[in-house]
């Protein structure tokens, strides 16, 4: 089969020919239809410090996908050949304290699909059946292919009650844009998103934000007070950028008693005004991945109840043009980029 692999240290991803993997007794063999390029895949492509310290090479990459069950192990129950599935990319141990308590997203021994074990940028993927999520028929392939990052957005956005609240999101990447759409869908009052990338701020507008703010040119507090008539600060914050200055600004504009969810990963140490955190009595929660599998059920329900993610999907390529897909991601002028394993050449 064909697969996209990190074959050696250094920049790049390579198309290779390799053997179709054999499922173990508790595994599914999934034939991949479509995949999506994640920021993690870009880190691996660029071979930055995180990637070089984390990913063994060679490694088939990718963890955002939709496919169909093509085979299964002898112990698998509840799936049939031809079932359309996506899957949880964090493979947990099942025996640590958190796993045994049903909190698998907190597993200390998590392995990442496409990071620590072979990934989904391939014609076939082997995945523990426990990790597979059977998809409702009314969720299209393009949307199903981005369920993994959508899950990050849903986990972050639904960490706190949003009904009637004023929400600040820092970082208008695809996950930030999807989190904004979730916040509006479930009843937030104002949803404000900040970034310095005009392309991505425009995507956020298409996803329904109240106001998109380029903080390189506009003052966030002025927008909040003068345009939106908000004089006490934001109730809920979602930090999606990994930017230290963005997080510092978020802390400064939160209302007393505000709640902050952190998904963005900083590239280095970040200075925090702990006095503001203490005297405003802020709640800060770290987010990693998705709750298994409550987040997945909520994702499906949100789509089935009318949440539209299609504006965030901006590029499609056949697998023969995978390099163009990575180039689009590297440009910073894209939302989600879909790679079609059933088409050689296609772009939009």
Swiss-Prot record:
Gene3D superfamilies recorded: Medium-chain alcohol dehydrogenases, catalytic domain, NAD(P)-binding Rossmann-like Domain
Family matches, as SUPFAM superfamilies: GroES-like (SSF50129), NAD(P)-binding Rossmann-fold domains (SSF51735)
The answer to whether the entry has keyword RNA-binding is no
Cellular localization per UniProt: Cytoplasm
* Main location group: cytoplasm
The residues listed in the UniProt record as binding NAD(+), with positions renumbered to this chain, are 175, 195, 200, 263-265, 287-288
Residues the record lists as binding Zn(2+) 2: 93, 96, 99, 107
InterPro entries listed in its UniProt record? ADH-like_C, ADH-like_N, ADH_Zn_CS, GroES-like_sf, L-Threonine_3-DHase, NAD(P)-bd_dom_sf, PKS_ER, Zn_alcohol_dh
Q: Where does Zn(2+) 1 bind?
A: 38, 63-64
Q: Give the UniProt entry's GO cellular component terms.
A: cytoplasm
* The enzyme's E.C. designation: 1.1.1.103
What SMART domains does this protein's entry cite?
Answer: PKS_ER (SM00829)
Pathway(s) where this gene product acts? Amino-acid degradation; L-threonine degradation via oxydo-reductase pathway; glycine from L-threonine: step 1/2
Function, as annotated? Catalyzes the NAD(+)-dependent oxidation of L-threonine to 2-amino-3-ketobutyrate.
Q: What is this protein called?
A: L-threonine 3-dehydrogenase
Q: Which gene encodes it?
A: tdh
